[in-house]
């Protein structure tokens, strides 16, 4: 009951005193409470202008409320009554507003300066305040207290500013006192006579000097007060004074000159010890381990004991332990040597006694032979001398025959070849000399040997990766044709005998630039090996354990700039290794000739007739592959990338191993320029096809040929064309040749007859391998609409020359890198069944060389084309219907039902639905047209259902 009643009483008292102002001023208390919290609940932390500003703001607000609500509060009535008498109501309001503005300027001086363009001179306000105080002191009496002006900024004051303010205040006081003194003297001398003027002046000078002396004492006293004020209110200045006082103390054993105040001020840990033993202990234990501001700058008498530095304590302890361990090992080896020597001497003595008893030179069944006791003694003396001259560190090499001597204590074993001690001692000398010589040689050539071994190991490892692919090729001799002469290698140009000179300084410079650029991006590691090839130089960089491989891949452009290269390729990581391969083009690129590849042992020893030459790897070794194991090849590359050169090399390598009876070629060249040089060679199955419609017919007929071969092999009960041909040799039947279909530009065919071409290529790629039909498909634009998912899935082996974009490389290789190739035959090859990518450089064969080979083949045998592959299937269907004389196909009714139900009239659709050949499907469509079910084909080749 007390609390509610008291609250109501306070509420009424508040309304009685302040009226309407009582509803608003409590909110200002919230602001004051927050500011009081920020000042750490100390009124001393408030600046004087802030206190004046708060007070004036409160008073001006109270005055404004008294002007408007003078009848609602007792205090408001009193304030309004006082100011209305002096200023009136309007004047009181204006005065309150000006006072409120002045309080805001005091509280926010920077805001007032920037916005209101009002700036107060606080020194002038101090003078006004001092004058007002002196006036009050004169009126009401009392001493004129000199306030410490520095109190306006009590938090961490600066000593110089504080002193300046003190001296300024003192100068003001001096001037005020001298003015007062002059006024008193003038008042006292009004009634004086002219004779007393001189005495008054003397008295004035004495009083002035006395006042000056008092002011000097006041200056010193005020300075001490200011210092005490600084130490009391500033933690930073106190810490600085403590550290500075420590530095001012000099070495004195008694330390009697330090005042008690300074001793109390300095912490105990900063005081110097008074005993010499304590000083030594600090020097040995703490002086080197502690920070510099804790060290004692004193001179310590040098002791005889060596003071070990504590900075590398762990390293020194580890080193001492290693030295002790090494000494123990040496002592142990010396002790073991002494034991072995004693055992040998004892065994020799036993042998001497045994020899003296038996008096025979050679003991049967023993392992040693002795000439006489004299020779034994001489030999033992020689062995003792040798043992004395030997170093104890080489204990492992001393007395290698000692274990053999120990076997004398064992029972008799099978006889072994007899050895003389002379031979043993001589062998021991020779081994020691040999070991010493080899050790010196190894020490002198250690680094060179390591580099050579490392280089050979890395080179062998790189060759092993490529040879793992080459070993998959079947080795053997190729069966030479009997009635056909293969072209000689003389038609091909010889490679230049100029050997590539390895510029080691240039390679070292590239390694330095590479590592320096990587370190700039905080990537640590080292180049562990370097391969110099005909086109590129490969650096194997082993990154640190904390480096992500993706960071190195993202720096490809930066590394290209650092190495000043045209383009580089980063293989991260190299399969089977813990390194990243960085391939940089050489300054001088060598030309690789086709003759080099065809003369290589790898190509000669390959048994397969479909071995094709792909070029050289990054080391410079020849690289070939078997088309039967690919079994189809997809090639991509922009104009000028060397794609046509690579295809020509593959074709020539096939022509150098096969006669027209074992190999037939079908070339589709929509550009009409690439394969025109091969026209009329005996290996061609058809003329070079340049018309897209004929190309579709040729592919459809090739599918029919594939089906025909499968039926033949099924009748012969064989699984592939090799077994079928062997069986035909035994039976005297006709052998089937290999057929290689080469399409130079797939994109043009996909634009004219995309679905049909995709279907036929898919059929051939899926099933034609066993029948001896292989595809080599090339395109300049490996986009998704050209290299569709069906084609890409059925052509696992791919070669990519330089492409224009990263996405093209991703489409053809499923990996980046082809966009960074150099062109001119530089390519990436993906073997089937592996995820590794092999970088190759295609060989070059000029048009003049190709012409000589083509002419040589033409002169031996004329070409025999199979025109049935190029016939239009629709015309074939008409002729077959006429020849049938009204005979209807067995699937006629079913085909009619499919077309009427599905509404599709294309030959390829009917072929897929009925799973028949293209020719039969075309015949059925023609029969439906003749019977009036389908219309004739329009300009686009489409038919309508009638």
Curated annotation (Swiss-Prot):
Coiled coil: none
Gene Ontology BP annotations: cell division; chromosome segregation
One GO CC annotation: plasma membrane
Pfam family, one: FtsK_gamma
Entry keywords, A to Z: ATP-binding, Cell cycle, Cell division, Cell inner membrane, Cell membrane, Chromosome partition, DNA-binding, Membrane, Nucleotide-binding, Transmembrane, Transmembrane helix
Cytoplasmic side: 113-946
CDD domains: TrwB_TraG_TraD_VirD4
Transmembrane keyword on record: yes
TM segment ranges: 15-35, 67-87, 92-112
Gene Ontology MF: a single term: ATP binding
Matches recorded under SUPFAM superfamilies: P-loop containing nucleoside triphosphate hydrolases, Winged helix' DNA-binding domain
Sequence positions that bind ATP: 640-645
Domain FtsK: 620-810
Disulfide bonds: none
Topological category with respect to the lipid bilayer: Multi-pass membrane protein
Predominant location: membrane
Matching PANTHER family: DNA TRANSLOCASE FTSK (PTHR22683:SF41), SPORULATION PROTEIN RELATED (PTHR22683)
Family: Belongs to the FtsK/SpoIIIE/SftA family.
Subunit structure: Homohexamer. Forms a ring that surrounds DNA.
Comment on protein domains: Consists of an N-terminal domain, which is sufficient for the localization to the septal ring and is required for cell division, followed by a linker domain, and a C-terminal domain, which forms the translocation motor involved in chromosome segregation. The C-terminal domain can be further subdivided into alpha, beta and gamma subdomains. The alpha and beta subdomains multimerise to produce a hexameric ring, contain the nucleotide binding motif and form the DNA pump.
Name of the protein in its database record: DNA translocase FtsK
Organism of derivation: Campylobacter jejuni subsp. jejuni serotype O:23/36 (strain 81-176)
């Amino acid at each position: 009951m007390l609390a509610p009643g008291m609250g109501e009483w306070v509420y009424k008292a508040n309304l009685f005193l302040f009226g309407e102002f009582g509803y608003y001023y409590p909110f200002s208390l919230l602001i004051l409470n927050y500011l009081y919290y920020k000042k750490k609940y100390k009124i001393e932390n408030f600046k004087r202008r802030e206190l004046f500003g708060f007070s004036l703001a409160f008073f001006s607000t109270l005055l404004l409320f008294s002007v408007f609500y003078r009848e609602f509060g007792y205090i408001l009535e009193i304030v309004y009554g006082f100011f209305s008498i002096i200023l009136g109501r309007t004047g009181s309001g204006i005065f309150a507003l000006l006072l409120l503005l002045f309080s805001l300027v005091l509280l926010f001086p920077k805001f007032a300066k920037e916005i209101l363009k009002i700036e107060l001179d606080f020194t002038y306000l101090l003078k006004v305040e001092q004058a007002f105080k002196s006036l009050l002191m004169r009126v009401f009496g009392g001493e004129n207290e000199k306030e410490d002006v520095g109190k306006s900024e009590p938090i961490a004051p600066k000593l110089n500013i504080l002193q300046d303010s003190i001296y300024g205040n003192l100068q003001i006081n001096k001037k005020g006192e001298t003015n007062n003194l002059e006024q008193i003297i003038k008042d006292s001398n009004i009634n004086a006579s002219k004779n007393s003027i001189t005495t008054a002046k003397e008295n004035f000078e004495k009083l002035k000097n006395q006042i000056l002396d008092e002011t000097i004492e006041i200056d010193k006293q005020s300075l001490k007060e200011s210092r005490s004020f600084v130490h009391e209110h500033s933690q930073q200045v106190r810490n600085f004074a403590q550290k500075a006082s420590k530095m001012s103390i000099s070495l004195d054993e008694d330390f009697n000159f330090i005042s008690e105040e300074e001793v109390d001020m300095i912490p105990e840990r900063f005081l110097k010890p008074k005993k010499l033993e304590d000083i030594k202990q600090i020097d040995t234990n703490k002086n080197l381990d502690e920070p510099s501001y804790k060290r004692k700058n004193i001179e310590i008498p040098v002791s005889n004991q060596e003071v070990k530095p504590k900075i590398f304590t762990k390293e020194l302890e580890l080193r001492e332990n290693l030295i002790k361990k090494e000494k123990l090992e040496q002592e142990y080896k010396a002790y073991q040597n002494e034991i072995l020597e004693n055992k040998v001497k004892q065994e020799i003595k036993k042998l001497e006694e045994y020899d003296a008893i038996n008096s025979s030179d050679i003991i049967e069944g023993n392992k040693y032979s002795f000439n006489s006791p004299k020779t034994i003694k001489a030999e033992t003396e020689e062995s003792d001398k040798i043992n004395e001259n030997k170093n104890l560190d080489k204990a492992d090499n001393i007395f290698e025959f000692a274990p053999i001597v120990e076997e004398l204590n064992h029972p008799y074993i099978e006889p072994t070849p007899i050895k003389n001690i002379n031979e043993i001692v001589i062998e021991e000398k020779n081994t020691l000399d040999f070991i010493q010589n080899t050790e010196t040689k190894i020490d002198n050539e250690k680094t060179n040997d390591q580099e050579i071994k490392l280089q050979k190991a890395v080179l062998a490892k790189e060759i092993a990766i490529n040879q793992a692919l080459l070993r998959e090729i079947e080795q053997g001799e190729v069966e030479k044709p009997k009635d056909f002469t293969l072209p000689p290698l003389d038609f091909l140009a010889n490679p230049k005998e100029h050997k590539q000179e390895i510029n080691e300084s240039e390679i070292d410079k590239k390694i330095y630039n590479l590592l320096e650029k990587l370190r700039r991006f905080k990537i640590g590691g080292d180049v562990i090996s370097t391969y110099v090839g005909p086109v590129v130089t490969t650096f194997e960089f082993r990154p640190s354990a904390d480096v992500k491989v993706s960071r190195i891949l993202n720096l490809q452009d930066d590394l290209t700039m650092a190495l000043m290269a045209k383009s580089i390729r980063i293989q991260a990581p190299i399969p089977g290794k813990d390194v990243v391969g960085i391939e940089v083009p050489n300054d001088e690129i060598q030309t690789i000739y086709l003759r080099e590849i065809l003369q290589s042992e790898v190509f000669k020893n390959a048994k397969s007739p479909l071995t094709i030459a792909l070029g050289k790897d990054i080391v410079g070794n020849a690289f070939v592959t078997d088309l039967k194991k690919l079994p189809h090849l997809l090639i991509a590359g922009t104009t000028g990338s060397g794609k046509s050169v690579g295809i020509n090399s593959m074709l020539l390598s096939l022509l150098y191993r096969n006669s027209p009876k074992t190999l037939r070629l079908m070339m589709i060249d929509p550009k009409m320029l690439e394969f025109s040089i091969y026209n009329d060679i005996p290996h061609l199955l058809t003329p070079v096809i340049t018309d897209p419609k004929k190309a579709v017919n040729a592919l459809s007929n090739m599918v029919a040929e594939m089906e025909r071969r499968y039926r033949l092999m099924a009748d012969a009960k064989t699984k592939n064309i090799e077994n079928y041909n062997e069986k035909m040799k035994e039976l005297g039947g006709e052998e089937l040749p290999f057929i290689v279909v080469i399409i130079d530009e797939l994109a043009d065919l996909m634009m004219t007859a995309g679905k049909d071409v995709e279907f036929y290529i898919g059929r051939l790629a899926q099933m034609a391998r066993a029948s001896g039909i292989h595809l080599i498909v090339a395109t300049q634009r490996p986009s998704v609409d050209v290299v569709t998912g069906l084609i890409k899935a059925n052509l696992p082996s791919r070669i990519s020359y330089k492409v224009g974009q990263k996405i093209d490389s991703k489409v053809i290789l499923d990996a980046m890198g082809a966009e960074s190739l150099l062109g001119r035959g530089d390519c990436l090859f993906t073997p089937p069944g592996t995820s590794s990518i092999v970088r190759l450089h295609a060989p070059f064969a000029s048009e003049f060389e190709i012409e000589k080979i083509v002419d040589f083949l033409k002169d031996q045998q004329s070409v025999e084309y199979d025109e049935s592959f190029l016939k239009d299937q629709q015309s074939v269907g008409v002729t077959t219907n006429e020849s049938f004389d009204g005979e209807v196909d067995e699937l006629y009714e079913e085909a009619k039902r499919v077309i009427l139900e599905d509404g599709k009239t294309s030959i390829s659709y009917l072929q897929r639905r009925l799973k028949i050949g293209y020719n039969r499907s075309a015949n059925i469509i023609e029969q439906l047209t003749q019977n009036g079910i389908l219309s004739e084909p329009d300009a686009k080749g489409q038919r309508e259902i009638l």
